[in-house]
Amino acid sequence: MMGTMTESMSDLKNALENLSPAQHGFSYLDLERAPVAEGDLSGWIIPAKDLYDVAGMPTTFGSKARTRMATETDPFIAAYEARGALIPGKSVSSELGLTVDAEPRDLPAVHNPIWPGRTPGGSSGGAAAMVARGLVRAAHGSDGGGSIRIPAAACGIVGFKPSATTLAVHGYLTTSVEDQAFLHQLEPVLDRPLRIGVLTTPIIADTEVQSEYLTAVAEAAEKLAAAGHEVIEVGGWPEAETTFDHFTNLFSYRLAELEHYDYIAEWLREKGLHVTAEQVRESETYARTLQARLAEHWGVDVILNPTIASDPPATGAFTSLPPAENFAAQARWVPWTSLFNIAGSCAISLPWPVPGRPQPAAVHLGSLTLDDAELLALARQLHV
């Protein structure tokens, strides 16, 4: 289970002494690095996801063959570094963030600290593992289809995807909602009761939902109802297949000119080569109106659903499959999260205790009408 939070680089060094890369989740370490500024994040140690550049550190993009030395720092990472945070290294990601595991190409895979032998989820799996293990208080991640929320769910921590006009958005993995609000510089305030829709029907894949996750959602719904919200059951999304087609268009089109491709990157690149610029424009137009149409269809402010359909699968469960089967298996495990990426909505995964075992399940709140601060305020009613 989660360890005690480290509070200094000295603590981090000591904590790492007996851990392998597969356990600690770092793809690169610079334990002599010093803060570049002082600010409200002074004292925070926040590793950067290894899909993004930090000057003076290698960026692997989740693949040994893609590794390069960075000369500049990604703007999002530079912004939290300018607030005083220290970046001790990079966290493991799947290749290009394309899959919901933490198994980079020709580099060590990361193990789930609370589920030995199983995936920590992904693509921000290294970040989730180090937060869940208590090595750091927070870690940087990014979410283009669930890549913050899925590993947070798999590792029993909190993952928040801010609202955005693009599929992918930067964010953090933490152990608390309070830390999410502080990191994003938001004041969580909710001044009205909400209408909340409980959705347990998988959206993008036909799959069975494990009972522990259904129970978690039911218990969360009861707690929200007790807090004064109107909670109703909602059915599936009739446009699910069309929505996922648009998501796949936008997700794969950016890979059409990819170099150094094989396995699932090659498979997605091939799909992207068949997506036209006109189809991309159609998908972007569809995405811009999706959140409002979801709100109208369901008639709710927020959707409450399981984050993942079951406990994490074994390490290698996805990568052992041919690419098309891998992609389909991922969709069966995470049949909800990408809906909120294409809609541009903010969304959050929260751990939920399961009696009789140490590992929690996970519930997910996806906004249809709330802004980021309001969703965090609602999440705080379920998990501090």
Predicted regions and their residues:
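Enzymes and membrane/adaptor proteins characterized by extended Gly/Ser/Thr/Asp/Glu-rich
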Residues: 42-76
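A short acidic, glycine-rich active-site loop
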Residues: 65-71, 114, 118, 323-335
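Short, well-ordered beta-strand elements
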Residues: 359-369, 375-376
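Short amphipathic alpha-helices in soluble, non-transmembrane regions
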Residues: 378-382
